[in-house]
Amino acid sequence: MAFVVGEYDYIEAKDSNGVLIRVYTPLGQKHFGQFALDVALKTWPFYTGYFKIGYPLPKPDLIAIADFAAGAMENWGLVTKRETALLVDPDNSSLQSKQRVAIVVGHELAHQWFGNIVTMEWWTHLWFVFLDKFVWF
């Protein structure tokens, strides 16, 4: 479980299955979250269709947090990320920055299935949580 308290802007859209996805950004930076939202809108229906398991919460949220030490964390329903792992300047970000954001968004959303809906039986099975790497191949 996670929650964030602060002043944020957000952008939102529904994916092809009608699931509302929100990306929270620092105030005045909504346009920097659009790329991550676009990636999430394509990734979310893929996972839902591939695993044939719907998401039991009303919506997933992604939030950019300044100086977030972990880089990113797949909390149940609230994916928290360092700003550099979620925000993209549409006019100035490099292709490498966009690729990094796309990989991190896909990775953390996959954890909503691997690690949240289905989780390991014991710590010796920690590898299971990182099965999302299959999407890279």
Residue ranges and their predicted role:
Residues 109-125:
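Catalytic Zn2+-binding segment of zinc metalloproteases
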Residues 125-129, 137:
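Short, intrinsically disordered, charge-balanced linker/junction segments flanking boundaries
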Residues 1-106, 131, 135:
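Hydrophobic helix-coil surface modules that form long, contiguous segments used
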